Amino acid sequence: MTLLVGLGNPTLRYAHTRHNAGFDILDSLVSELNLSFAFSPKHNAYLCVYKDFILLKPQTYMNLSGESVLSAKNFYKTKELLIVHDDLDLPLGVVRFKKGGGNGGHNGLKSIDLLCSNSYYRLRVGISKGIGVIEHVLSKFHKNEEPLKNAVFEHAKNALKFFIESHDFNAMQNRFTLKKPLQIES
């Protein structure tokens, strides 16, 4: 089994903020597959099982995401872990993939690294930098950014669908990496 985790913060206060990119992308995927999440108190997360994937949205707040991830990883004895998360160091419109490496200051990844190691796959969604890191990641996308954000989230969702069918991270990486911001028609 593979654990597929979307990072974000719970509660309406943080809904659709830049830091909740992982939640939003997983929500879109689950909706398109006509599935739904159910809350698991055991893992303090919303879970959805599809094929041999466990889709997880931790409800611990970002800085403690590793607690939910470790709990689900151990319970389901998953072999692979893929984290979908926002990335300040990438411009909006860019999607990159990697295995392992540093956390880039991302507190959700720090928590996962501490409790689970850093040897996992990542789908990184660029959210650009702003003035004041905390304020920026907890802000919603500007109206003029919405079309690009929507297109990029759709692209990331399609990458996950491909991965679920192929189980091939390298093929997903080769097919769906966006090194430059996605170009959309106005």
Curated annotation (Swiss-Prot):
Where does it live in the cell? Cytoplasm
Q: What class of enzyme is it?
A: hydrolase
Keywords in alphabetical order: Cytoplasm, Hydrolase, RNA-binding, tRNA-binding
| Residues carrying the site annotation Stabilizes the basic form of H active site to accept a proton | 86
PROSITE patterns cross-referenced by the UniProt entry: PEPT_TRNA_HYDROL_1, PEPT_TRNA_HYDROL_2
> Which terms under GO biological process does the entry name?
protein quality control for misfolded or incompletely synthesized proteins; rescue of stalled ribosome
> Do you know which Gene3D superfamilies this protein is assigned to?
Peptidyl-tRNA hydrolase
> What EC number(s) does the entry state?
3.1.1.29
Q: Which reaction does it catalyse?
A: an N-acyl-L-alpha-aminoacyl-tRNA + H2O = an N-acyl-L-amino acid + a tRNA + H(+)
Q: Site (Discriminates between blocked and unblocked aminoacyl-tRNA): give the residues.
A: 9
How does the annotation summarize its subunit structure? Monomer.
- Know the name of this protein? Peptidyl-tRNA hydrolase
Say which species the protein is native to. Helicobacter pylori (strain G27)
Lineage, top ranks: Bacteria, Pseudomonadati, Campylobacterota, Epsilonproteobacteria, Campylobacterales
